[in-house]
Curated annotation (Swiss-Prot):
Protein name: ATP synthase subunit a 2
Keywords: ATP synthesis, Cell inner membrane, Cell membrane, CF(0), Hydrogen ion transport, Ion transport, Membrane, Signal, Transmembrane, Transmembrane helix, Transport
Subunit details: F-type ATPases have 2 components, CF(1) - the catalytic core - and CF(0) - the membrane proton channel. CF(1) has five subunits: alpha(3), beta(3), gamma(1), delta(1), epsilon(1). CF(0) has four main subunits: a, b, b' and c.
Function, as annotated: Key component of the proton channel; it plays a direct role in the translocation of protons across the membrane.
Signal peptide: 1-33
Pfam families: ATP-synt_A
């Protein structure tokens, strides 16, 4: 089988062209839905801490929810700027900072790998980061995009690569010290799902035209059943992004709650035995499991996005094939 260099075939240039506006769009939409209740939770937790009555639940919620304060215990904390324009709170939060960091990492990595491929000859083999990136691109290209979308998958490959790398980095940044899991913010996961939703609908319109797109809402049934089928099909359009939103949000939030709960068991019971044989071992196990889940959830979101695009663009004679 002939090996295709996706970086030299133009996929990389389209990926980079999509990356910056995609990331800026994510940040902008999350700005517009900043979580004011999270600030109240942080203020309440701080008030309890001053009085010495901070509960385990307050600490867990403070670590899970988005706030305008980045904690660097025991060195202190950084209060992020609060910005209100025209009555809209677009304050910078720690989840936004995490998305900035992930965006910067992606841009640097893609630039370095792109420059590396520009200086390579056709006989040279990629090494190090370039080799890892090529393996990742080939995996998404063949096992995710091509297998689920089929013909015309190339035009959707840059988006799928971007969303996979972005979600993966956000998941992993939530596992490092002083980090925060932006994918544990339902505003972030909803925004990602909205991107997939609009790309899917636009792809369907291009593949079938307006007439074919509207005909799909009737599911090929007799006109007498349209009053039933059309609402069902419309609901079905929105259940897909809803499933993407909740799946990623719930999985990334649950793991952190479990880890924090296990750690607090030893403090609640005030037992070194519990800490040594329950809290620490199980927390380490869940933490390692979270690393696996970080990769798994990024893959699932990307694969489902490709599957939805494939189902939306498949012609009637190939729908069964796309579904498989």
């Amino acid at each position: 089988m002939k090996r295709v260099n996706v970086f030299r075939s133009g996929v990389f240039s389209r990926l980079f062209a999509l990356l910056l506006p995609f990331l800026l769009g994510i940040n902008g939409l999350v700005y517009a839905s900043a979580e004011a209740p999270a600030e109240a939770v942080h203020a309440e937790a701080a008030a309890h801490a001053e009085g010495g009555h901070e509960s385990a639940g307050d600490v867990i919620m403070h670590h899970i929810l988005d706030t305008g304060v980045m904690s660097f215990e025991p060195f202190g904390e950084v209060h992020l700027p609060q910005i209100v324009i025209g009555g809209f709170d677009i304050s910078i939060t720690r989840h936004v900072v995490m998305m900035w960091i992930a965006s910067a990492i992606l841009l640097v990595v893609f630039l370095l790998v792109g420059n590396r491929y520009k200086t390579m000859t056709s006989r040279q083999a990629p090494g190090g980061m370039a080799n890892a990136m090529e393996a990742l691109v080939e995996f998404i290209r063949l096992d995710v995009a091509k297998s689920n979308i089929g013909a015309g998958y190339e035009k959707h490959l840059p988006y799928l690569l971007t969303v996979f790398a972005f979600i993966l980095l956000l998941n992993l940044l939530g596992l490092v010290p002083y980090g925060a899991t932006a994918t544990g913010n339902i505003n972030v996961t909803l925004t990602l799902a909205v991107f997939t939703f609009f790309i899917t609908q636009v792809a369907s319109l291009k593949a079938h035209g307006i007439k074919g797109y509207l005909a799909h809402l009737t599911a090929g049934t007799h006109w007498a059943l349209w009053i039933i089928m059309i609402p069902i099909e419309i609901i079905g359009l929105f259940t897909k992004p809803f499933a993407l939103t909740v799946r990623l949000f719930a999985n990334m939030t649950a793991g952190h709650i479990v880890i924090l709960s296990l750690i607090f068991i030893s403090f609640i019971l005030k037992s070194y035995i519990v800490a040594m044989f329950v809290s620490v071992p199980f927390s380490i196990f869940i933490y390692l499991l979270e690393i696996f889940v970080a990769f798994l959830q990024a893959f699932i979101f990307t694969m489902l996005s490709a599957l939805f695009i494939g189902l939306a663009t498949a012609h009637e004679g190939h729908e069964g094939e796309a579904a498989h």
